[in-house]
């Protein structure tokens, strides 16, 4: 049996995507819509307080295309907190006009290739990646993915050293986009339908296409990668929520 890779796990992660029932939303009076937006922003302010205390992080984006209208990405220390956030959101008036479109549950993950005598949880660089402050980049791209397990193309039957070598080559491509694309990898084996979630942040949306296209030629993606649905969107600052929902 091939050796399993040891992983480092950080904050739990929820991607919550909703579509807006615009027809129903329009039936409310201007005052009713205003109250619903204010209630929602009060919830968001609680998230901001958590982020300021460095006990979690979140991001809010509008989604381009018809797959969804809004994407929320929430990071918290426990799965229970993610559930509480989702429940609190669902109890708001605005949620009555939000239709669930997609969700993904995972945990921020890094592969541990450090020497056995080094405690990764004492390494500031690793801690910053396991418990990240999500950037306020202009754009987001999220997609789930698996490693293929078919015939000779079975990632999990490869020796550990061969997997390490290929992942190192794969990661070199990503490092070429340092400063252009910020990446958060989250593991989801046993949590959701795919094995990983990949979230990319960039101020230039075209960098998503360039990075993902270049990686497709690397063996890790070309031979072993299987991908789910892609979601891309634009940042939705708190101060623009009211305008976005205005009728």
From Swiss-Prot:
Care to name a GO molecular-function term for this sequence? peroxidase activity
Query: What's this chain's function?
Result: Involved in coproporphyrin-dependent heme b biosynthesis. Catalyzes the decarboxylation of Fe-coproporphyrin III (coproheme) to heme b (protoheme IX), the last step of the pathway. The reaction occurs in a stepwise manner with a three-propionate intermediate.
Answer whether the UniProt record assigns the keyword Oxidoreductase to this protein. yes
Q: In which pathway does it act?
A: Porphyrin-containing compound metabolism; protoheme biosynthesis
Membrane-spanning segments: none
Look up the EC number in the record and give it: 1.3.98.5
The catalysed reaction is:
Fe-coproporphyrin III + 2 H2O2 + 2 H(+) = heme b + 2 CO2 + 4 H2O; Fe-coproporphyrin III + H2O2 + H(+) = harderoheme III + CO2 + 2 H2O; harderoheme III + H2O2 + H(+) = heme b + CO2 + 2 H2O
| Family in the record | Belongs to the ChdC family. Type 1 subfamily.
The residues that the entry says bind Fe-coproporphyrin III are 129, 143-147, 170, 183, 221
Record-linked HAMAP family: Coproheme_decarbox_1
Q: Which Pfam families match?
A: Chlor_dismutase
Claim: Iron is one of the keywords in the record: yes
Active site as annotated: 143
Gene responsible for this protein: chdC
Please list the cofactors this protein needs. Fe-coproporphyrin III
InterPro entries registered for this protein in UniProt: CHDC, ChdC/CLD, Dimeric_a/b-barrel
Name the keywords, alphabetized. Heme, Heme biosynthesis, Iron, Metal-binding, Oxidoreductase
Q: PANTHER family, per this entry? A: COPROHEME DECARBOXYLASE, HEME-DEPENDENT PEROXIDASE YWFI-RELATED
Native source organism of the sequence: Bacillus mycoides (strain KBAB4)
Q: How is the cofactor bound?
A: Fe-coproporphyrin III acts both as a substrate and a redox cofactor.
What is the protein's name according to its record? Coproheme decarboxylase
């Amino acid at each position: 049996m091939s050796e399993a890779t040891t992983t480092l796990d950080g904050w739990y992660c929820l991607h919550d995507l909703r579509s807006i029932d615009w027809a129903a939303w329009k039936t409310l009076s201007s005052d009713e819509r205003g109250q619903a937006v204010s209630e929602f922003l009060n919830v968001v302010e609680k998230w901001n307080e958590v982020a300021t205390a460095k006990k979690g992080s979140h991001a809010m984006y509008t989604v381009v295309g018809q797959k969804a209208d809004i994407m929320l990405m929430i990071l918290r220390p426990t799965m229970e907190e993610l559930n509480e956030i989702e429940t609190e959101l669902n109890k708001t008036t605005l949620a009555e006009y939000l239709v669930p479109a997609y969700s993904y549950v995972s945990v921020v993950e890094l592969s541990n290739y450090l020497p056995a005598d080094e405690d990764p949880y004492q390494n500031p660089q690793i801690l910053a990646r396991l418990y990240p402050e999500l950037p306020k980049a202009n754009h987001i791209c999220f997609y789930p993915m698996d490693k293929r397990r078919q015939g000779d193309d079975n990632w999990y039957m490869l020796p550990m050293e061969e997997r390490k070598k290929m992942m190192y080559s794969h990661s070199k491509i990503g490092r070429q986009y340092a400063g252009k694309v910020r990446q958060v990898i989250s593991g989801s084996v046993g949590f959701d339908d795919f094995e990983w979630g990949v979230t990319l942040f960039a101020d230039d949306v075209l960098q998503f296409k360039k990075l993902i296209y270049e990686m497709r030629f690397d063996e890790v993606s070309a031979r072993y990668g299987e991908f789910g649905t892609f979601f891309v969107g634009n940042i939705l600052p708190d101060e623009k929520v009211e305008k976005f929902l205005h009728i």
